[in-house]
Design a protein with these regions (language model features):
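Conserved Rossmann-fold NAD(P)-dependent oxidoreductase catalytic core, especially the SDR/UDP-sugar
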Residues: 96-137
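C-terminal substrate-binding subdomain of Rossmann-fold SDR/epimerase-dehydratase oxidoreductases
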Residues: 192, 197-303
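NAD(P)-cofactor binding segment of oxidoreductase domains
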Residues: 67-68, 81-111
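NAD(P)-dependent short-chain dehydrogenase/reductase
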Residues: 149-204, 209-214, 244-247
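N-terminal Rossmann-fold NAD(P) dinucleotide-binding loop
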Residues: 15-16
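NAD(P)H-binding glycine-rich loop region in Rossmannoid oxidoreductase-like domains
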Residues: 52-90
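Conserved N-terminal Rossmann-fold NAD(P)-binding element of oxidoreductases
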Residues: 6-10
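Conserved catalytic-site region of short-chain dehydrogenase/reductase
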Residues: 77, 112-126, 139, 145, ...
Length: 303
């Protein structure tokens, strides 16, 4: 890792987790976020309040960092569902402004967080590998896929596209229509109903946040690594199975409110993770039941 350090664009759930991981390994880390100074940051992490659309600010930050990890995106699959203009304005447009600021720095190494849960749509077979066609069903997935296409104009040896699955764990904010595990745990703790969209047989790949940050840290430490990488656990869990796991962890029966399936929702997605296994000597270490237990304890301690 270069002494020039790592710039993380986006200080949300994943950006903060990555900053803590990399700083804990002794790397110099800066985080750019619109409200970076609102939350305390440990020593060794320089928090900068600002937006990626600020060309002058981005220019100054990029000049002092050799590696950039881009985690900022203004939509979720639910928030931009059926709203392509919102996806363009809140998701893709700010990213393109960042990419414009990056143009004078072709030597910068960029790791971009795409979306393994949405860009593939419903693939023909599972698990889905990185060379499968991109066929998103949602506006959010289309925005991420478009960003990936723009990145093909960058030097390929300095560009990594990361396609994470459904990441969960301590630190995840409660957002409507996003983060099923946190929502289920909150519903169980507060005796609130959980809205289940569709038949509950939707298959998802869930990755614990510490396993995610470990994978990204390993890639940043391998300067030869480039290209596209799926980041997941490599196994599928249905929503009904997830409900059962949360009920077993909490000892409470969830009250389910059945809702019609939503247009644009992926039905089945499990990621093939052989490429990241080989490139970074990485494998997920956290069982889903254990990750749910750790998340429940964190929620109880931070209620």
């Amino acid at each position: 890792m270069s002494e020039a350090g790592v710039l993380i664009v986006g200080g949300g759930f994943l950006g903060r987790a990555l900053a803590l991981k990399l700083a804990g390994e002794g790397r110099r880390v800066s985080v750019l976020s619109p409200r970076a100074e609102d939350a305390p940051w440990p020593a060794g992490i320089a928090a900068v309040s600002g937006r990626q659309e600020d060309r002058a600010l981005m220019g100054r930050l990029l000049a002092g960092h050799e590696t950039v990890i881009h985690t900022a995106w203004g939509t979720t699959p639910g928030s931009s569902a059926g709203r392509p203009e919102l996806e363009g304005e809140a998701g893709l447009r700010p990213f393109l402004a960042f990419l414009e600021a990056l143009q004078p720095h072709p030597g910068a190494r960029l790791l971009f967080l795409s979306s393994g849960g949405t860009v593939y749509g419903d693939p023909a077979s599972l698990p889905v590998a990185e060379d499968a066609p991109l066929q998103p069903r949602s506006c959010h997935g289309a925005g991420k896929a478009a960003a990936e296409l723009f990145l093909r104009a960058r030097p390929p040896e300095r560009t990594l596209v990361l396609r994470p699955s459904n990441i969960y764990g301590p630190g995840q904010a409660l957002k409507s229509g996003f983060g099923a595990i946190r929502h289920l745990l909150v519903c169980a703790a507060e005796a609130r109903p959980f809205q289940l969209w569709g038949d509950g047989l939707q298959l998802r790949d869930y990755l614990y946040v510490d396993d995610f940050t470990d994978a990204v840290a390993r890639l940043t430490a391998r300067p030869q690594a480039h290209g596209v990488f799926n980041l997941g656990c490599g196994a599928g869990t249905s929503l009904r199975e997830l409900v059962a796991l949360v009920e077993a962890e909490t000892g409470r029966t969830l009250r389910i409110e059945a809702q019609p399936a939503r247009a644009g929702d992926v039905v089945r997605i499990v990621l093939d993770i052989e490429r990241i296994r080989r490139a970074a000597d990485w494998a997920p270490a956290t069982r889903l039941a254990d990750g749910i237990a750790r998340t429940r304890r964190w929620l109880a301690e931070n209620a």
